[in-house]
């Protein structure tokens, strides 16, 4: 049992916060998943970062680059600005946040409006850096059974 404070900024202990998502419990909403992903970067949990990315994108992730960025950064904090649950089938959401870190090049901050989709009781991050080759009439990569244009297409490219 960990007695450390969760890196996500909630003020809760890791085991009572993001730690149980890292251990396999599905995050209940997109904001919880986003916070747990930030904590995973802080803790170097690369398998968790990959597993919580949309399955159709997982093969396109550069695990070594993710691990290097995670390890070479000192994580300074996370601010969640907004979480929008959009509903629908499957359910979609946006979470707007700013993450701060320090590396050899100095202090950085990154503001993003991330898109998420829920499938089979689990939330997944839709990674804007991983290309998907899905035509508008192709089956949606989130495995909803719908055409891409009726499901996740509008969530690609909607970043702040």
UniProtKB/Swiss-Prot annotation:
<dbReference type="InterPro" id="IPR048469">
    <property type="entry name" value="YchJ-like_M"/>
</dbReference>
<dbReference type="InterPro" id="IPR023006">
    <property type="entry name" value="UPF0225"/>
</dbReference>
<dbReference type="InterPro" id="IPR032710">
    <property type="entry name" value="NTF2-like_dom_sf"/>
</dbReference>
<dbReference type="Pfam" id="PF02810">
    <property type="entry name" value="SEC-C"/>
</dbReference>
<dbReference type="Pfam" id="PF17775">
    <property type="entry name" value="YchJ_M-like"/>
</dbReference>
<dbReference type="InterPro" id="IPR004027">
    <property type="entry name" value="SEC_C_motif"/>
</dbReference>
<protein>
    <recommendedName>
        <fullName>UPF0225 protein PputW619_1140</fullName>
    </recommendedName>
</protein>
<comment type="similarity">
    <text>Belongs to the UPF0225 family.</text>
</comment>
